[in-house]
C-alpha cells in the first residue's frame, strides 16, 4: 500500500504485482531463446512446455497474471482510469483473498530465477 503521495492508501497493482510477473517472464524467455511470443501469458505457456519441472510455477504465474489483469481492468472501468492503483478497502473479502493468493506465484518465480541464475548473494 502506498504510504504517501497522490495514491496514498492504495495498492500499486502494476508496479508491485504485474511488473514482477512480466519481468520474470521476459528474463526467463530471453534465457531460453524464446522469440516471437509477445505476451506474458504466452511466455509462461511456452516456458512450461520447455521446462516441465517448473511447469506448475509457470502455470500459476499465468493464472495470477490473468487474475491481476482482471482486477486492473475492473478498477479502471469503475474509476474511468488506467486501473493501476487499487483501493483495497473497496474489495470484497473474497477479492482480498484472491489478491493475496496471487502473490505466492510471484515469490515462487523469484525463487526459480534466483536458482537458475545463482543469485543467492542478493537475498
Where are these regions (language model features)?
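Conserved nucleotidyltransferase catalytic core and NTase-mimicking acidic/glycine-rich helix/loop elements
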Residues: 1-123
